[in-house]
Amino acid sequence: MKEFDADFYAAMLNTAIVLGYWEKDWKTLRATFDLLHLSIYLCFDVFAKNTARDFSNYLEKDIDAYDHPYPGIRMYYCEVAIADLLIKIKGDNERIRELIYSGFHAIIAYERQALEKEKYRDSYFAIAGTQKGVRHIRGLINGWNEQVEKYSHYSYIPIYKTDKVEDLLYFVGEDGEFLH
């Protein structure tokens, strides 16, 4: 839970900083958000490489075998936090969706072109789409929501709480391929 809190806070803080570019031209704003997404990716890329974690050892090991969630899970819920904050502040509209899609596209393009990752299972996001991954994400989000009341007594600012996640769809099999 501590990592979820720290990751979520970092994603929200960086998004708030980048929102300072809102009045800039569209090209600058989009490039700035792409850089935000790429910087989060690169951060979790370092964690993944330093801990030698990949798709196969995530599926083989117990979720609690490590003291930190898998980097792809952490990156995924940070991206969700960014999208959620954008929508809450600027509304759910075409421009916001374009910013979010652009950030994901920047990550995918970086993985495919710069890192030459050929298969989806090689992407850090792949884990988040597995049955085990969605259960893990749901557990982290709902677990955090249960802790908010406890920690709010120690906080100087309101603690961000998300809606309860009842269910998430998984779309990646244990082989790393998309389910049909």
Where are the predicted features?
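Non-catalytic terminal regions of proteins
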Residues: 27, 55-180
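Short helix/loop segments within enzyme catalytic domains
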Residues: 1-55, 81, 92
